[in-house]
Amino acid sequence: MASSLNLGSPAPPIKVQNWLRGDPLSNFQLGKIYVVEFFSIYCGYCAPELSDLAKLHKKFIDTRVEFIGIAASEEAATADDARAQVDASITKSLPNTNIRMGFDHSGEMDEDWLKASLSFHVPKTFVVDRDGSIAFIGDLVMLQDVLPKVIDGNWRASGKQRMPKRSGLLKARLMLRRLFHDRVSAAIEIKNWKAPLSAIEEGINLNPDSIFLRRNLYWHE
């Protein structure tokens, strides 16, 4: 299966049914950089990821970077139920946030962004460059290195984006998150509700300094 949304591709449009936080956005403005973070209330580490998004927003508050959160893959009986659940989740994880938060239950955003880029899990981060093209697709944790280069205009070389080399620490952190996600997803699949909490507690015993795991412990309690 080939990806139809790649680095350098024109960014798909923003098509949400509701803006739950922030001012509505109908399209990307040329000359601005956008960070678009896809999340879900059913994702084990999306809540701490949104907290990290808020920290990045604060760090780059003086730049022309816009931060957007999108919930586009929620499962519920009705769109109203899904929207209410997402709204409650945002209130819990990001109270009083001024980051734009959009909700789409039509499937268009999921199809045009996630499936088109072969991104089959959330959270997933996209960066839209000043010319309206996709500059980055990947993990939010990598934006500490990527975003300053996009802002400075040094991210592209000869018209091609270069993915930053991942340090050993970064690789370990990403692997930890993916292993955690796989274990929690498998537990939920068989309705073993105690297993996610057990996985978090085991992870904290192995890595007591992990803010990511401690946030998940809070979220699951």
Curated annotation (Swiss-Prot):
**Domain of life assignment:** Bacteria
GO molecular function annotation: antioxidant activity; disulfide oxidoreductase activity
Q: Which cysteines are joined by disulfide bonds?
A: 43-46
Protein's UniProt keywords contain Zinc:
no
Gene Ontology process terms (BP): nitrogen fixation
**Keyword annotations from UniProtKB, A to Z:** Disulfide bond, Nitrogen fixation, Redox-active center
Q: Which InterPro entries match?
A: AhpC/TSA (IPR000866), Thioredoxin-like_sf (IPR036249), Thioredoxin_CS (IPR017937), Thioredoxin_domain (IPR013766), Thioredoxin_ResA/DsbE_sf (IPR050553)
This protein's record includes keyword Iron: no
Span of domain Thioredoxin: 5-156
The UniProt entry, under Pfam families, shows: AhpC-TSA
Family recorded in the similarity comment: Belongs to the thioredoxin family.
**Name of the protein:** Protein FixW
